[in-house]
């Protein structure tokens, strides 16, 4: 089994490390691979789209032919986790800023996002979050973070902060406005791993 982390831009090594630690804790044998070009996504049982700069990420995913592969994987039910910029990339609709930059979003989650929901006013901060899938609060690390403004009926809201949706799930797709890979708390990566193992 392979779990792939999109590695063309963004916080890659932290996700790779968190996934490897989560696998070890679960006692599961699997390979965590970095996806830098076309052809790797179809081999993966789970895909992580990390943070970074969403405009650049969208452009590189399209240019490298990875965007279409992710859409196909999502349609087949492969679990996908998008964090921070990844939350923007997987959305169906962006705000005016996203539209202005001409970002081609993957549209695999029925959400409308605000690219700089927590960004301009406070560049980075931590907040204790109540997350529906966890039994105790999770420390969310927010770095110029986006947020989900609205979502379709098939999307389950998992957490809110200041009225903004910061975690959501739609079937096999999980979106987070924060960076779980920047904490020592592996519960969200373990939850994602369970989705991979059960799909």
Curated annotation (Swiss-Prot):
One of its GO terms (biological process) is pyridoxine metabolic process. It catalyses: aldehydo-D-ribose 5-phosphate + D-glyceraldehyde 3-phosphate + L-glutamine = pyridoxal 5'-phosphate + L-glutamate + phosphate + 3 H2O + H(+); L-glutamine + H2O = L-glutamate + NH4(+). The keyword Iron-sulfur does not apply. It comes from the Archaea. L-glutamine binds at residues 52-54, 115, 143-144. One of its GO terms (cellular component) is glutaminase complex. Pfam families: SNO. The active site is at residues 84, 179, 181. Its EC number is 4.3.3.6, 3.5.1.2. Pathway: Cofactor biosynthesis; pyridoxal 5'-phosphate biosynthesis. Gene3D superfamilies: 3.40.50.880. InterPro entries: Class_I_gatase-like, PdxT/SNO, PdxT/SNO_CS. One of its GO terms (molecular function) is glutaminase activity. Keywords: Glutamine amidotransferase, Hydrolase, Lyase, Pyridoxal phosphate. Catalyzes the hydrolysis of glutamine to glutamate and ammonia as part of the biosynthesis of pyridoxal 5'-phosphate. The resulting ammonia molecule is channeled to the active site of PdxS. PANTHER family: PYRIDOXAL 5'-PHOSPHATE SYNTHASE SUBUNIT SNO, PYRIDOXAL 5'-PHOSPHATE SYNTHASE SUBUNIT SNO1-RELATED. Belongs to the glutaminase PdxT/SNO family. This is Pyridoxal 5'-phosphate synthase subunit PdxT. It comes from Methanosarcina mazei (strain ATCC BAA-159 / DSM 3647 / Goe1 / Go1 / JCM 11833 / OCM 88). The lineage of its organism: Archaea, Methanobacteriati, Methanobacteriota, Stenosarchaea group, Methanomicrobia.
